[in-house]
Amino acid sequence: MRFEYPGDPHFAPLAGRADAPNNWGAFGAHDPSLIFAEGAYYAFSTGTFGENYYQIRRSHDLIHWEYAGQAFPAGIAASLAPVLRAVERVYGKGTENDTLWAPDIVPAQGGGYWLYGCYTAAFGKNYSAIFLANAQNIEGPYIYADTLVLTGGDWGLQPNAIDAQIFYDGEGRMFMTYGSFYGGIRILELDPRTGRRKDGLTYRDFAARKVGREAYFGRHVLRSSNAEGSVVAYKRGVPVYRGDIFARAEDARLWSQTDRYYLMCSADSLSQDYNMRVWSSEFPDRGYTAPPYGFAGQKAAGSFSWRRGAEDPRIGFDFFVPGHNDLFTAPNGVEVAAYHCRTPYSDRREPRAHYLFVSLCAYNSKGELLLSPNRYAGERLRKIEREELSGKTFDYVQIGSGNFDCAYAKSGICLEGNGSLMLCGEKMGEWKLYGDNFVAFTFDGMRYFGAAMPAWIEAEARGGITISARGEDGLPFFLNRAF
């Protein structure tokens, strides 16, 4: 039987010069937000390297990117004067920042586009504002429309008005999550007709004590001191298996479907120990948890590499401190996560250049959101046959609870035809393939639930299979095999 795997995507080299934006491609993108508009994919991202006013990149395949300019080329003072004045008032002096951070771009009702942006007075402080701008064309020009949230001081009691992300619930209600670090992640309901706050409240109402903190800033969806870059995605009909696949054979009667909201955030320092975490809930604005860590979330990814060590020449990059991702569904139904990633890994905690990475998304049989541990190369989820896995040897990456070290790949896991999982000839557990592409296995006493999917295996420069799994300890386990 012939199986379909992605061909060579001809990724552009991970290199770039800060002073040559026309040649950047994926280089320099930070905190990306994706949209499909006017026949192409667009990524809006934080300002960097002098292109400070929201960078825009264009792609026709989610693989190759070209720089398309800035959302506010005239700058903050000229384009966003009301935002600048509002932040200066709460800061009590002139601001110390000339960069726009972490945008989100969505279609506007009735046509055009809504750009949700943020501006902060100084790095490391919460004197910030989230604003709305609009444009008729995806590449702009964008025009200021309103300020939705203004914060400043009492960080912890107040949130930080940055990192806005928009989503819609199953009934079409519009929400915005935002916040970072000590103030936690908050949520506000917006009016889908206008893109503005549904309650119409302003900072003046809060400053005059007409309303309290929760009314103005929104309720907490996550109380955290180290999370930022929230994104929520609503998914219908996620398959969930209610049986114990290790104890007995798959029973079709034990499958069901569920509707869930998935919250992703990134935690810790963006240049040293950044890592991507995930929660889920039955409700859009509350109840997000992730066993076994609850409000701490399950780890979707931390720093890892398909190199087998720092000197391995087979692949020239690592997935170093990946984070601040968007969750995006393409017009053809393919679900991906877009995030920034630094490379290569440095044990000296040196800042590294950041790039736009995209990875395929999947779900395990517990309904948990997973990421392919490979860059997207045009693949789609499909049914995986047993002969694609049985008797095959895989490289693997086991990510631990620590976040400062890079988890390098190791070789030697074999999924035997008799259901045994072997490591270098020693039995370490068992494995199961069930449903269309679900894989469960045990390794050294821990149970893992994952999904198998096609992938471009960059370390081997060939197409193949990847398995992304999460253990009952909430930690990821990845396997790659090229054909």
Question: Model features per residue range: what roles?
Answer:
Residues 1-483:
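Carbohydrate-active catalytic/glycan-binding domains of CAZyme proteins
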